[in-house]
């Protein structure tokens, strides 16, 4: 699990606390505050952010009144939505959300972060279990096909 934390620069302190809480839960998280590779060139920055979001498993959006003036937060959400990344919002002071963000789960305190991580880990385990089951079925299908080939070759 790797979480991209999207936030307005005015919310960097809260985003850092969220980053710390995720790390305490053994979750890899990206926060631009700790990124020495950030550049001021808008084209390079855009590509850098796109790569970071693409290489994340989730996006956590810090929502505050400042977010309403952000250009980058909606951009990052758009990249994540395009990839169908699981998205959660962290509401600062119960800010009212734009309608398009109302769909995703809302974290309202630091106590919600372990709940988010637990739910996400449980879902990832289910997906892994289903994948293992699919691989096993595929393997059985192959071995069944191989058995068919062997029988047919013997009969021919």
Task: Place the predicted regions along the sequence by residue.
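Short low-complexity, flexible loop/linker segments enriched in glycine and/or proline
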Residues: 43-47, 76-77, 102-106
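Conserved TIR/SEFIR loop-to-helix hotspot centered on a Trp-containing motif
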Residues: 65-83
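Conserved N-terminal substructure of TIR/SEFIR domains
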Residues: 1-56, 140-156
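C-terminal interaction surface of TIR/SEFIR-family domains
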Residues: 3, 13, 94-156
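Generic beta-sheet signal
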Residues: 32, 62, 90-92
């Amino acid at each position: 699990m790797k979480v991209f934390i999207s936030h307005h620069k005015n919310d960097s302190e809260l985003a850092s606390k969220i980053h710390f809480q995720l790390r305490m839960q053994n979750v890899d998280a990206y926060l631009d505050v700790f990124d020495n590779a950030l550049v001021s060139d808008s084209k390079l920055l855009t590509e850098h952010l796109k790569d970071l979001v693409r290489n994340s498993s989730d996006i956590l959006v810090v929502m505050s009144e400042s977010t309403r003036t952000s250009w980058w937060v909606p951009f990052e959400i758009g990249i994540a939505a395009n990839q169908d990344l699981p998205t959660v919002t962290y509401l600062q002071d119960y800010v009212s959300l734009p309608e398009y963000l109302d769909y995703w789960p809302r974290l309202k305190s630091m106590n919600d972060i372990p709940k988010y991580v637990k739910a996400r880990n449980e879902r990832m385990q289910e997906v892994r279990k289903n994948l293992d089951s699919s691989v096993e079925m595929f393997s059985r299908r192959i071995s069944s096909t191989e058995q068919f080939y062997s029988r047919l070759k013997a009969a021919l």
